[in-house]
Every structure is written in structure tokens, then in C-alpha cells.
Amino acid sequence: MNCYHVKKIAGPADIAADWNSADWKDAEIIKINNFRPESSNHHPEVECRMQHDGKGFYGLFQVKDKYIRCVATEYNSSVCRDSCVEFFVEPPGGQGYLNFEFNCGGTMLLFYVKDCTRTDKGFKDF
């Protein structure tokens, strides 16, 4: 498991700003190199920067890939079938975790997973 320090900032981050903009240049970069075992051997280069202001957290992903797919457009649709990134946040003292997934078009899927035990219908409790 990778650990990453999320820098605290004074106010909301501009998520429309460029990767190297003043808003983001001081945020630590983490290289994402964990891929699901059932994925193909094709692994694009992925980096992420994150920040928080005490009220929310903000992230930018940078993906370098020559093959992309972007079909899902509805909130909470199956973006995992598209070119996507995902990350997980475990709240302190809480049960479970938040699962965020974004496709390359910006469509988001978000679940709060209380029990990640796999069943034939997905997770046991989400």
C-alpha cells in the first residue's frame, strides 16, 4: 500500500488549473503503479497530486496513454469499463472506505463500501 501526504492549503484548489500551475506545483506527485490483476499488460503512465483545505480534498491525475475509451457519461455509471483512474479513502475511525473512480471524460463513480467481502452481486455492503 502506498502512503501519500496530502498537503493542506488555505482554500479550495482550482481543479481546472494546469498540472504545473501555481495552484498545484507544490503538491507532492505520486506515481500510480498498482494495476488490477485481471487487467491487460498495457499499463499507462499515471501520476496524481492531491491537496485539502480542511473542508474538502482535491486531486489531479495525469495519464499518458495512446489508447483511450470513454463511453460512460452518467454519474455512478460503470466507468471501470472506460479508461479510468480510481482511488480509495479510509476515513479515520470509520468502517469501510470511499471508492472514487473517474473516466477520462470526467464521469465519476462513488461508493461508500462498508464491507468489501465479494459476493456474486458485488460487494457485501455498499
Report the location of each language-model feature.
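Structural preference for beta-rich elements and adjacent junctions enriched in aromatics
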Residues: 1-126
